Amino acid sequence: MSIGCSVGGGVSLIELADTYGTPLLVYDLNRVEVNYRALVDNTGARVYYSIKANGNLALLRFLRSLGAGADASSPGEIYLALRAGFRPGDIMYTGSFLSNTEIEYGIRAGVTFNFDSIRAFEKALGLGYEPRLVFFRVDLGYGRGFTHGVTLAGEDSKFGMFINDAIEAYRLAKLKGAVEYGIHAMMGSNVLDADYFLKIANLLRESARVIEDKVGVKITHYDMGGGFGIPYKPGEPELDLSKLRGLRGYFPGELIIEPGRFIVGNA
């Protein structure tokens, strides 16, 4: 039987199945690298790969070798990142409604925390967390889900805190001895419109300015989480990354992005 099915540089899937047996998952690391470098080259950002997209250790090790950091949302994902060789300082830990046990795991691991609420930050302080570099996730009031009914920003969203709560969180971090500050926003999910990301960048920078003015701190790390999409249906456009070459210029400090499916979805 002949089936014209290949992957990567013409490698036959039939031959791979004959060699390794089935069921078999095959990843094209060349495609992973192309996707990774396209984001880095066009945005000027540091990539923290979102482990929730695919936590395969071989993929994680490969992305680490390219220079990526890791975005983790649970102790399990922190564990995978550490197993793959990521340094704790290159792991961003963002979770909604983290339990004491989940927070304690992150503290012991020494990862960078991105707190979703002032309550979570206060809980961590009570468990012995000592902030040095600390991120807070801010709800910009604007965000797109991958399908109708998925809310990523605004009153009904679980992601992040509104500006007044964020101001109080940064004030508390300053009081507790933090020396570096980051700000994070959930951009959306599977967005294919490049102009949308520029709008989010502007909103994030404006939120940072307000916080800096009110609290008297300097935000030096800007994290745009999620968002970068890939087409799933015939006729859907690809995300035009060339329009994002000015993205880095919106921010006076380090820009971080947290792609997942864009890196591995078509690999």
Regions flagged by a language model, labelled:
Residues M1-T112, R119-R132, L175, V179, ...:
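A charged N-terminal "starter" segment
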Residues L29, E33, N100, I118, ...:
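Non-membrane alpha-helical structural segments and their capping/turn regions in soluble enzymes
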Residues N30, K52-N56, S73-G76, S96-L98, ...:
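Active-site beta-loop-alpha junctions enriched in small/polar residues
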Residues N35, A81, I163-A178, L204-V215, ...:
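Structured alpha-helical segments in the cores of large, soluble enzyme domains
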Residues L60, Y142-K158, G182-F197, H221-L239, ...:
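Active-site-proximal beta-alpha loop/turn segments in soluble metabolic enzymes
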Residues G69, M92, N114, F135-R137, ...:
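Structured core elements
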Residues D116-V179:
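Conserved anion-binding
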Residues Y196-A267:
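C-terminal active-site-proximal or functional interface alpha/beta core segments in diverse enzymes
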